[in-house]
Amino acid sequence: MSPAELHADSIVIDGLIIAKWNRELFEDMRKGGLTAANCTVSVWEGFQATVNNIVASNKLIRDNSDLVIPVRSTADIRKAKEQGKTGILYGFQNAHAFEDQIGYVEVFKQLGVGIVQMCYNTQNLVGTGCYERDGGLSGFGREIVAEMNRVGIMCDLSHVGSKTSEEVILESKKPVCYSHCLPSGLKEHPRNKSDEELKFIADHGGFVGVTMFTPFLKKGIDSTIDDYAEAIEYVMNIVGEDAIGIGTDFTQGHGHDFFEWLTHDKGYARRLTNFGKIVNPLGIR
């Protein structure tokens, strides 16, 4: 079987996409043979703004039903493969949308959310992100983890601090993930994960999605597909082939204002980082 045949035969899932949703993007997903993806619908937004995002996303999926379908279960992913479409799984990059209401976890599950990152770079009511001194998982956070386990929402730790991540891994009764990360063994960066962190999540049944977001790759914006492949190989040698996948963190369609919003705490406060120029690795559109 050739690489192209293997790709065509496989169920291909992207661990995270935060691109601007439109028909052109959905067409690219079909051309690329993408079966399903974790698609971000909340970062800094609270409850109501996140519901509004989901309402808009639902309409976009309906209007492009020849290309995409909503994902509520693994059966929907298989259905997407059979129909030659891409399954859209809603995900959060921050538990901020739960506010201080444990009951909101189930509400969002019923709205189609299947994965939630516990923190986005900074402190919230659940725990601490990777750009702050890490105080660990809060008592409220433990209740949120338990409720996410109960209703079937996966805990994502990609932007989460090391101590909070470890405590979520130990607290969760179900597997958790780094949906989109890179190894600090190739480049030191607050967003990258150490060899020990990668091994710990894999040893506890978790999953690691390797991102191609160039600011975190070894050569930055000068990175190529070869550099991305090197990162995949590096992580696989630590976690094993059964615990590794891809989480591209694609951002197609977004402009300067979007990245300014992402890189300031709560979307407007202190600057957390400056990505500079955002490009995909050479060879990827």
Language-model region placement:
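Histidine-centered catalytic micro-motifs
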Residues: V12-A19, V160, Y178-C181
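Catalytic beta/alpha-barrel core
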Residues: I153-V160
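Histidine- and/or cysteine-centered catalytic micro-motif in compact active-site loops
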Residues: V160, C181-P183, T211-P215
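A short alpha/beta connector and helix-capping loop motif
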Residues: I169-L182, T263-R271
